[in-house]
Amino acid sequence: MAGEMHFIEFSKPFIDAAKNIFETMVFSKLDAQKPIIKNDSVSRGDISAVLGLSGEVDKNGTKCQYKAMLVISFPYETYFKVASAMLGETYTSYVPDIHDLGGEIVNMVVGNAKRELKNMGYTSNMAIPSMVEGKSHSIKYPAGTHVVLIPFNSSNGELFMELCYTEVE
């Protein structure tokens, strides 16, 4: 149960950071929908930005290791609209110019979340973001994690945040 409580506490900074990044960089509000536990590895979007992180959390004076991963997935149309809003050009197809944009977004979200996580007693080491593109692509989550899927609505369309977290004893 303690791990579940830490997961809930761990999730909030990522949701808040995503909302902030989209308001300031994409000029669009994100409206979080009801989270669900994800039971498969298939992405809900066509383009996914993936970033792993690990670190320690202080639990009642005892250091506990954790590992986590954040995925933000976009349907193609949403990704093109987000790219257009951020870069000031119109995109209607997946081109090299916008390939890394999702990675930049997920990097900014995790960077913003890290500040709040630090205030909550977490240390965080970030991996390098990676991008996965294609209909019905799969995401490989860290072993032993449960994945929470948080759908978001925005003026640019829907997108999906997937977050997994586990404490390593």
Report residues per predicted region:
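N-terminal auxiliary interaction/assembly segments of multi-subunit proteins
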Residues: 1-169
